[in-house]
Amino acid sequence: MEDDCDIIIIGAGIAGTACALRCARAGLSVLLLERAEIPGSKNLSGGRLYTHALAELLPQFHLTAPLERRITHESLSLLTPDGVTTFSSLQPGGESWSVLRARFDPWLVAEAEKEGVECIPGATVDALYEENGRVCGVICGDDILRARYVVLAEGANSVLAERHGLVTRPAGEAMALGIKEVLSLETSAIEERFHLENNEGAALLFSGRICDDLPGGAFLYTNQQTLSLGIVCPLSSLTQSRVPASELLTRFKAHPAVRPLIKNTESLEYGAHLVPEGGLHSMPVQYAGNGWLLVGDALRSCVNTGISVRGMDMALTGAQAAAQTLISACQHREPQNLFPLYHHNVERSLLWDVLQRYQHVPALLQRPGWYRTWPALMQDISRDLWDQGDKPVPPLRQLFWHHLRRHGLWHLAGDVIRSLRCL
């Protein structure tokens, strides 16, 4: 039987759509299947896009892309139950933007359609179609759609890939649950509250006592007329906790360092999303095969650097490697096992460099000291530095030495040594 197209891609998220666009640009016929009626309506991310990979895909993206604000203000806050120590910086030349996936994804799909991609929203893929051990299409209801190659870009919850035995379910330690809320706030209030002007944006990251005693982090990004607020906590830790995930977000919003930032806001959106932040060691051993390959969150290519989570830009970078693989494979008449070529292209990409660079960070972030001891230490030191009571402030070295010993010098030293080895 003849193929319906060269490439079928399951999932019109950032990775799937970018891969489709590149393949179509090279002259391949591409069918992009999306289960949502509107692309982006089922996609959730923190909301910060590093645009280097987008610029390679669409050099003139800034003319039409629905970007929110250019991130120029950065801060990292270490929270204790009732206090905070914050490190902040101003970077006017930053090349990252806040985005809302409900607006960004439809735009990216439209750009892909301009290159000839056929996108079918509201399409449910029930199974992969296989012949003689090779994936050569998909089954949608009573219909079989055939293609030379199939790309699985179905997200972190890779139901089809797991059902067909292409990958195994990831360990709980390798997955996190992100809970996000979009809050409405007038533009003038956002710019006044976060000290912004001229379409500037702020990225506020939080660590410490966010998810009670659980490891985790949180974020707040400014958009044009909304705030993106959320927490991220390891799935394995959540399953051991008796606190519902939604309650953790509620407690975070009530923290004295967060509450003033979100006052007089109204909730517009709320959702949860699995985040594959296990890094290099959580990637599937075999992420491509006879007629198929994985891309995006299905590839588990999200990278937690410790102070940021790089998801969307890594999805775009991985999509480039996937498209290169498919374009090369389609030049051969006989079907190809995609893994050798795909692995070669991934290893030559920025994605692989970043994955290797931060491969030990997930294990490092499991150490409880980062969430308990270090925030408390920084708060104690800063409090004593600013204390102007009736007693003279002790020498700085004496102050540091006192608090280091009180919080456990050797445990702190162990954290530092492991960090230096990892980073």
Swiss-Prot record:
<feature type="binding site">
    <location>
        <begin position="7"/>
        <end position="21"/>
    </location>
    <ligand>
        <name>FAD</name>
    </ligand>
</feature>
<keyword id="KW-0285">Flavoprotein</keyword>
<dbReference type="Pfam" id="PF21162">
    <property type="entry name" value="ETFQO_UQ-bd"/>
</dbReference>
<keyword id="KW-0274">FAD</keyword>
<comment type="similarity">
    <text>Belongs to the ETF-QO/FixC family.</text>
</comment>
<keyword id="KW-0560">Oxidoreductase</keyword>
<dbReference type="InterPro" id="IPR036188">
    <property type="entry name" value="FAD/NAD-bd_sf"/>
</dbReference>
<dbReference type="InterPro" id="IPR049398">
    <property type="entry name" value="ETF-QO/FixC_UQ-bd"/>
</dbReference>
<dbReference type="InterPro" id="IPR006076">
    <property type="entry name" value="FAD-dep_OxRdtase"/>
</dbReference>
<protein>
    <recommendedName>
        <fullName>Probable electron transfer flavoprotein-quinone oxidoreductase YgcN</fullName>
        <ecNumber>1.5.5.-</ecNumber>
    </recommendedName>
</protein>
<dbReference type="GO" id="GO:0005886">
    <property type="term" value="C:plasma membrane"/>
</dbReference>
<dbReference type="InterPro" id="IPR039651">
    <property type="entry name" value="FixC-like"/>
</dbReference>
<dbReference type="Pfam" id="PF01266">
    <property type="entry name" value="DAO"/>
</dbReference>
<dbReference type="GO" id="GO:0016491">
    <property type="term" value="F:oxidoreductase activity"/>
</dbReference>
<comment type="function">
    <text>Probably accepts electrons from YgcQ/YgcR and reduces a quinone.</text>
</comment>
